């Protein structure tokens, strides 16, 4: 088992039914899927300001799952609390979040990097005082709207739900993201990067 493998998976999103299944919550979606598959019960933990659970996964060892419930812009507070409590290093985490600059059907693993325009990542980098931690970006595509107000178009896009026509591809993306995550946990982030960063999924062609 690789020495650089993550042990804490952090999915970013906004809490509450209002934001469930929105593009901005694709990180939450993957954590929920992993929790279900691994039999992990996620419970609200006040000291962590998030939904938290842990388990021993066969072949992967002890894994912790976290969904910050601070709202996206304060995600770093929740993650910092977990790192301090368990004395984990930034290199032991994998942050999973949405990325508009990648099309739906692409994912990108990196060992470090900037936050770009993602406010959840800005909060995490600020609270960790470091950009050196693994992350998994899941593409949600750019807004299709040609609105003159780019900010409004962006907000509407990330807080909007995936279209019916995107649901099949979304499921494939989550399948692939789960594979990539489990590879990172088992063999290290670099191995997962080499195996999955070049993969590209496309929506199935409509039946004639």
Swiss-Prot record:
The keyword RNA-binding applies. GO terms for molecular function: peptidyl-tRNA hydrolase activity; tRNA binding. Its EC number is 3.1.1.29. The keyword Chloroplast does not apply. InterPro entries: Pept_tRNA_hydro (IPR001328), Pept_tRNA_hydro_CS (IPR018171), Pept_tRNA_hydro_sf (IPR036416). The record marks 14 as: Discriminates between blocked and unblocked aminoacyl-tRNA. GO terms for biological process: protein quality control for misfolded or incompletely synthesized proteins; rescue of stalled ribosome. The active site is at residue 24. It is found in: Cytoplasm. The record marks 98 as: Stabilizes the basic form of H active site to accept a proton. It is an enzyme of class 3 (hydrolase). It catalyses: an N-acyl-L-alpha-aminoacyl-tRNA + H2O = an N-acyl-L-amino acid + a tRNA + H(+). Gene3D superfamilies: Peptidyl-tRNA hydrolase (3.40.50.1470). Keywords: Cytoplasm, Hydrolase, RNA-binding, tRNA-binding. TRNA binds at residues 19, 71, 73, 119. One of its GO terms (cellular component) is cytoplasm. NCBIfam families: pth. Belongs to the PTH family. Hydrolyzes ribosome-free peptidyl-tRNAs (with 1 or more amino acids incorporated), which drop off the ribosome during protein synthesis, or as a result of ribosome stalling. Monomer. This is Peptidyl-tRNA hydrolase. It comes from Synechococcus elongatus (strain ATCC 33912 / PCC 7942 / FACHB-805) (Anacystis nidulans R2).
């Amino acid at each position: 088992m690789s020495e650089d493998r993550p042990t804490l998976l952090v999915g970013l999103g906004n809490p509450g039914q209002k934001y469930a299944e929105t593009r901005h919550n694709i990180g939450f979606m993957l954590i929920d899927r992993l929790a279900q598959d691994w039999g992990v019960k996620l419970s609200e933990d006040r000291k962590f300001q998030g939904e938290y659970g842990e388990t021993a996964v066969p072949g992967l060892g002890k894994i912790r799952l976290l969904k910050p419930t601070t709202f996206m812009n304060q995600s770093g507070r929740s993650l910092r609390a977990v790192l301090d409590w368990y004395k984990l290093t930034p290199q032991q985490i994998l942050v999973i979040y949405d990325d508009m600059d990648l099309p739906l059907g692409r994912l990108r693993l990196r060992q470090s990097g900037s936050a770009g325009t993602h406010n959840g990542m800005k909060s995490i980098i600020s609270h960790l005082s470091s950009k050196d931690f693994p992350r998994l970006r899941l593409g949600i595509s750019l807004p299709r709207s040609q609105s003159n107000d780019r900010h409004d178009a962006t907000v509407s896009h990330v807080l909007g739900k995936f279209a019916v026509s995107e649901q099949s591809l979304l499921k494939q993306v989550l399948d692939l993201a789960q594979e990539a995550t489990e590879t990172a946990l088992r063999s290290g982030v670099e191995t997962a990067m080499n195996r999955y960063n070049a993969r590209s999924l496309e929506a199935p062609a409509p039946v004639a």
